[in-house]
Curated annotation (Swiss-Prot):
It comes from Chlamydia pneumoniae. This is Ribonucleoside-diphosphate reductase subunit alpha. GO terms for cellular component: ribonucleoside-diphosphate reductase complex. Keywords: Allosteric enzyme, ATP-binding, Deoxyribonucleotide synthesis, Disulfide bond, Nucleotide-binding, Oxidoreductase, Repeat. Its EC number is 1.17.4.1. Disulfide bonds join 456-685. PANTHER family: RIBONUCLEOSIDE-DIPHOSPHATE REDUCTASE LARGE CHAIN, RIBONUCLEOSIDE-DIPHOSPHATE REDUCTASE LARGE SUBUNIT. The gene is nrdA.
Amino acid sequence: MVEVEEKHYTIVKRNGMFVPFNQDRIFQALEAAFRDTRSLETSSPLPKDLEESIAQITHKVVKEVLAKISEGQVVTVERIQDLVESQLYISGLQDVARDYIVYRDQRKAERGNSSSIIAIIRRDGGSAKFNPMKISAALEKAFRATLQINGMTPPATLSEINDLTLRIVEDVLSLHGEEAINLEEIQDIVEKQLMVAGYYDVAKNYILYREARARARANKDQDGQEEFVPQEETYVVQKEDGTTYLLRKTDLEKRFSWACKRFPKTTDSQLLADMAFMNLYSGIKEDEVTTACIMAARANIEREPDYAFIAAELLTSSLYEETLGCSSQDPNLSEIHKKHFKEYILNGEEYRLNPQLKDYDLDALSEVLDLSRDQQFSYMGVQNLYDRYFNLHEGRRLETAQIFWMRVSMGLALNEGEQKNFWAITFYNLLSTFRYTPATPTLFNSGMRHSQLSSCYLSTVKDDLSHIYKVISDNALLSKWAGGIGNDWTDVRATGAVIKGTNGKSQGVIPFIKVANDTAIAVNQGGKRKGAMCVYLENWHLDYEDFLELRKNTGDERRRTHDINTASWIPDLFFKRLEKKGMWTLFSPDDVPGLHEAYGLEFEKLYEEYERKVESGEIRLYKKVEAEVLWRKMLSMLYETGHPWITFKDPSNIRSNQDHVGVVRCSNLCTEILLNCSESETAVCNLGSINLVEHIRNDKLDEEKLKETISIAIRILDNVIDLNFYPTPEAKQANLTHRAVGLGVMGFQDVLYELNISYASQEAVEFSDECSEIIAYYAILASSLLAKERGTYASYSGSKWDRGYLPLDTIELLKETRGEHNVLVDTSSKKDWTPVRDTIQKYGMRNSQVMAIAPTATISNIIGVTQSIEPMYKHLFVKSNLSGEFTIPNTYLIKKLKELGLWDAEMLDDLKYFDGSLLEIERIPNHLKKLFLTAFEIEPEWIIECTSRRQKWIDMGVSLNLYLAEPDGKKLSNMYLTAWKKGLKTTYYLRSQAATSVEKSFIDINKRGIQPRWMKNKSASTSIVVERKTTPVCSMEEGCESCQ
């Protein structure tokens, strides 16, 4: 049993009294319930099995109680009994639980007839029950105001408050017994006990507060406002300048009424005012009142998604007050906003803005600012912008959302010459309507003095000590300005290789990767988020088996890298050996020159030549392993640690547009960027994503609108290259020479919901194909037309574009090296590509690469859509990031359930109980269950096939997460082999089900009659028919945000 030092823990009885927590009473209550249910005599000893059961349940309840007390929660007797009841059900003891509930109801009725309650005489002559919890609450408010506590009250302070409350209650009882007592007398006792305990400052503030309240009751407001009603509780609020004012609940009701005006049928301003008022205290700061209001709205999002817009409205109004000095209700808001924008830009050098922004026509730009677009944001979007994206000066935010979008747009149009005002307005209208969003580094830095706008950097590390540390130093510089990094380490010699200069033996690549890991965590991204990188190693490297274990939680910490990502760079030959159950040879790179640069049939020829040198004794440092054994170890580590990710070397190179000027040696932090890198070039890519949701009209893609969006987006991405601040000369050289950009998408799952298409269907596959083809068509065309205006990129001559290849054409090249049976890719198309081919032949291309689908974790949160091409993770879950925790309900699901009359508190409890899944909720129709399958309920083949259809059109890669609901080695192997055969170039995270789930202790299992899943004989999900497409598979047995 959990040992409890009882003097340190108190709980609250039903009459409000604080008493010591006594775990023996839980055991005794459980014993009584068991004896009653099992008809056991009180005098007879308990059977051993029952005694053990009672002890186990007591242990679990005590553990939960202590956890809640340690978090600063006030635990009541009722709450403990709820926990006991819940644990009885979880333990399968429903009969005991029922008797326990009956016993509780009887005791409740008996208590209702009791008359031994002290009465308080209020100031208006009325009476109320004496409640010590109100004393405790008043004390806590006084302590918080005096000690200037923000956030949760520290446990030590709560303990002091509990002790004081006990002494005050004892005084009240000893002085008055069961007689009625005046409220003023209780407050006198509170003052006395504060002084006796030595809390003089708290007592002083408490006395001043009582005097202020007395004056407010005695006098009318001097400005002619209505008199404070004595019965209405008020709080003293401290303004930033030190002055104070009194706040009533009716004041909060007015604030919430304004915020809720757009949603009168779905939101309740009175409810929010009640909730917010409960969290106030005397002496509270003005910004804490705003926080309490926002938290009240935020707490209701899970049951009604419209509260996300209420919370956003409240935060936006607070932002206006901070930035503009007026609230959202000010009739002159628009004019104040325009004036502030112009002053902000004109004084921008003081605020780290690019001084060239002053050269714009600020009057014209200010007229375009549209504050009504702020209403598009949900709470998560505004909070993300507020916490990390808006420009700050001495702790004060200088931007509203619309000024932020305009600052970014102005920064992106600086190279547009005489047309820069036109393009700044055009860019603003695109960004502020959520049609397209640049990646986070661009949002951070566009229009700023140091305009580092690029998302991804890829570099290779040479087998030379000075170059190793140069790359590590470069990593620090790149990460400082919010870039995500991919490092190729394959060229560094393996453990045991001879160092010719010293005649010593190399320690291999692992110690150097450890140094890179420590550098990544030492440099955070512009002070706004953690630095992030991914290291790549080909799986023929002799240190590869050690590389597999870099993310393990056990072993030598000097050979562990817990803070960076790892990825395997795998040639096709390995999978061919795996298919034939052949052997695989590991080499030190210094013994096999040219192997890392080779791919396809050339790699196979060279690799086999080196294997013959092993047999002849020319190469002595090597290791032979069974390909199948190594593959199992790769998958085992992937499942255990989430790393190394699986990426495919040959399709990344064979299908590369730039095969004439180098080799793709690795991918980036999020595995979607595939660019050449070398000792003289650090590959750079600039990212942005189209919001598909804004391009659906009449239940189909609006092709004309999408064409316009893509054309402007490609222009923005190309501008980034010329406007960018380059931390290293190698990055500048690569970006200006090849001008790679990565246009992606987000909101794919949202669109499927709007079109009533299940992700697990052929319809989703076809839509993925159609959508990707349209985007590729207009993206390539836009880059070519931009070449007409601005000229081709420097290394265009000899590229695949120049040789007449489009991305779709390169699949045939992959088939030539792999064999058609290993390239199971649909190559159909619907559009006539002749105009695109003719335009490229005539004008060339402005950008070497044009498309890549990044994860978009952050920017999709800003605009309120699902990430990238990801399926819905859960229909109700809590998301954590640097801005805090956010409850995420699936608004599309709730809308459907409302239409069917099924959305209620019970359904919300069901969603929590079943961890955000619908499959076992009996009253949800099967057609909705199929439409709203979560990521772990969709067979991986569907996700892979949808991605395969995209990948055929995309010239770089797709950041693709894969999901595995249960540990299954064969299924895991088949999943990745299918991805390889389906032509994917890379994969990203392997997501597995978390061991934890939604908090269920507040769910009344008995009342709702939920049958726990462990008691089910037949799942409600067994009647669902999910369309599945047969895919040939092998039968072998068994978070960065730079791209976001």
